[in-house]
């Protein structure tokens, strides 16, 4: 997968290209990591499902899906499930591969895509931090002023036009918020970036129904200075394009 930054009208248009994807129909997802899919080209395959969550609203049998293929002989499953088409509002592709957002954001950070982050001159990944030094933040942006600790969350669940996170109880996510609060208390900047992996949502809100404690903690973190960036992306079988910041609904 490749990132192509394109200059248009003096603005940076960020586009992340998928490899060639093959269409199919989802038969079922099971054991979290497996999905049976009927390929449009014929035949039924078992694909790797790179998403450990409940995938609320984005794992409906009979839905159109897209898969990638790998000829790596060391892989147990040659196909990986990448996208699903939902019809909550209008037909919309959703990226379900949870390994992808960090790769997308890493490339976006290299292109200084988000002016909200200000100036930084180095991007570090998987940096140890936190009260007990046992946590790792997705990105640390080195700045001449305050360094930025940035955590990325893949967001696929939606209620109408509102993207929601999380879609299940996440103790790990709660811990990340506490660690980010600690970063602010130490005088640095902390950012939680929600990558909205579908183009039909214009707003973002905490998924209180799924994890009330996370929603409460997220609001507390914002009050204490943790910055929230709910980033809208439109997804197609060819590419992912950045659309801007979604409105946060408290």
Curated annotation (Swiss-Prot):
Coiled-coil segments on the chain, per record: none
GO molecular function annotation: DNA binding
Gene3D superfamilies: 2.40.50.580, 3.40.1350.60
InterPro entries assigned to the protein according to its UniProt record, in alphabetical order: SfsA, SfsA_C, SfsA_N
Matches recorded under NCBIfam families: sfsA
PANTHER family: SUGAR FERMENTATION STIMULATION PROTEIN A
Similarity comment: family membership: Belongs to the SfsA family.
Record-given protein name: Sugar fermentation stimulation protein homolog
Source organism (scientific name): Trichodesmium erythraeum (strain IMS101)
Organismal lineage: Bacteria, Bacillati, Cyanobacteriota, Cyanophyceae, Oscillatoriophycideae
């Amino acid at each position: 997968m490749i990132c192509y930054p394109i200059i248009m009208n003096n603005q940076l248009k960020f586009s992340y290209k998928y490899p060639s994807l093959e269409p199919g129909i989802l038969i079922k997802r099971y054991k979290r990591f497996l999905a049976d899919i009927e390929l449009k080209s014929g035949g039924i395959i078992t694909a790797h499902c790179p998403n450990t969550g409940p995938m609320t609203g984005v794992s409906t049998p009979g839905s159109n899906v897209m898969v990638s293929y790998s000829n790596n002989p060391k892989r147990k499953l040659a196909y990986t499930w990448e996208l699903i088409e939902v019809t909550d509002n209008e037909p919309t592709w959703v990226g379900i591969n949870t390994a992808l957002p960090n790769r997308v954001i890493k490339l976006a950070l290299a292109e200084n895509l988000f002016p909200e982050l200000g100036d930084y001159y180095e991007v570090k990944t998987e940096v140890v931090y936190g009260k007990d030094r046992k946590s790792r933040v997705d990105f640390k942006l080195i700045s001449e002023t305050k360094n930025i600790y940035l955590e990325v969350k893949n967001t696929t669940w939606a209620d109408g036009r509102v993207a929601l996170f999380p879609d299940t109880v996440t103790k790990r996510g709660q811990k990340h918020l506490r660690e980010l609060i600690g970063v602010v208390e130490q005088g640095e900047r902390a950012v939680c970036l929600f990558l909205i992996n579908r183009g039909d949502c214009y707003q973002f809100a905490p998924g209180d129904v799924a994890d009330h404690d996370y929603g409460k903690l997220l609001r507390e973190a914002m009050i204490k200075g943790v910055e929230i960036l709910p980033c809208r992306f439109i997804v197609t079988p060819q590419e992912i394009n950045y659309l801007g910041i979604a409105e946060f609904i408290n």
